[in-house]
């Protein structure tokens, strides 16, 4: 505990928690303070000006991060016939239909993303209580229920991430690793912000992007000056 406290104290001394840093300075600071023995993830928290309790102000979607996520993603696809062959050719790790559903019911969930062709939803629908709590349930809003299963597989492999505002109107998303360059993290950050702006509900009034901060897995939040992102 003493070692952890000493580490956090050292990080806190480098970060002025009352200051808003230009984006690249913030990312560089987060990288510098990511001193754990593993490659920490770099995470973004965006406080949105929405009333998340209202269905017409829900914010949810997906975006392909141009510099990737730094993570190897295993993709499972529910499809049959030509769609199954297309998914396999696109690089899906697991392809199946009712047989895949049975594997999942048996507790074999060895994938990070699940994709389904529309006709497969009659099978996938039975798995809601298993996949839902794990954030793996295919959904058309994030592009994981689609007739273009091959395209969805390629996007997932290329670094697609999903985002969703929680009950407090906050979106949290990983945009890379501490080993990424600042330029790579900046590209990913701007792609996420662009996607969030495009997802702005028509019913949202006033300031939409209220506060943005970045942090590493074991670090503390660094506030971002939004004027540096325009």
Swiss-Prot record:
NCBIfam families xref list: rplA_bact
Assigned keywords, A-Z: Repressor, Ribonucleoprotein, Ribosomal protein, RNA-binding, rRNA-binding, Translation regulation, tRNA-binding
Name used for this protein in its record: Large ribosomal subunit protein uL1
One GO process term, biological-process aspect: regulation of translation
The protein's assembly and partners: Part of the 50S ribosomal subunit.
Species for this entry: Nitrosospira multiformis (strain ATCC 25196 / NCIMB 11849 / C 71)
UniProt family annotation: Belongs to the universal ribosomal protein uL1 family.
Function: Binds directly to 23S rRNA. The L1 stalk is quite mobile in the ribosome, and is involved in E site tRNA release. Protein L1 is also a translational repressor protein, it controls the translation of the L11 operon by binding to its mRNA.
């Amino acid at each position: 505990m003493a070692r952890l406290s000493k580490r956090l104290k050292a990080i806190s001394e480098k970060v002025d928690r009352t200051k808003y840093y230009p984006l690249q300075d913030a990312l560089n600071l987060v990288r510098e303070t990511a001193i754990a023995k593993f490659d920490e993830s770099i995470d973004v928290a965006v406080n949105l000006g929405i009333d998340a309790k209202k269905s017409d102000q829900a914010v949810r979607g997906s975006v392909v991060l141009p510099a990737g996520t730094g993570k190897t993603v295993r993709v499972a696809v529910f499809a049959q016939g030509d769609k199954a062959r297309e998914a396999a050719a696109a690089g899906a790790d697991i392809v199946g239909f009712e047989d895949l559903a049975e594997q999942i019911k048996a507790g074999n969930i060895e994938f990070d993303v699940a994709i389904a062709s529309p006709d497969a939803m009659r099978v996938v629908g039975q798995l809601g209580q298993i996949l839902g709590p794990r954030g793996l349930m295919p959904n058309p809003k994030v592009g994981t229920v689609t007739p273009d299963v091959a395209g969805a597989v390629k996007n997932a492999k290329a670094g697609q991430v999903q985002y969703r505002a929680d009950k407090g109107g906050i979106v949290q998303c990983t945009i890379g690793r501490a080993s990424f360059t600042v330029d790579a993290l900046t590209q990913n950050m701007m792609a996420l912000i662009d996607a969030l702006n495009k997802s702005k509900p028509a019913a949202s009034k006033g300031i939409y992007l209220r506060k943005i901060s970045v942090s590493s897995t074991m670090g503390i939040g660094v506030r971002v000056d939004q004027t540096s992102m325009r």
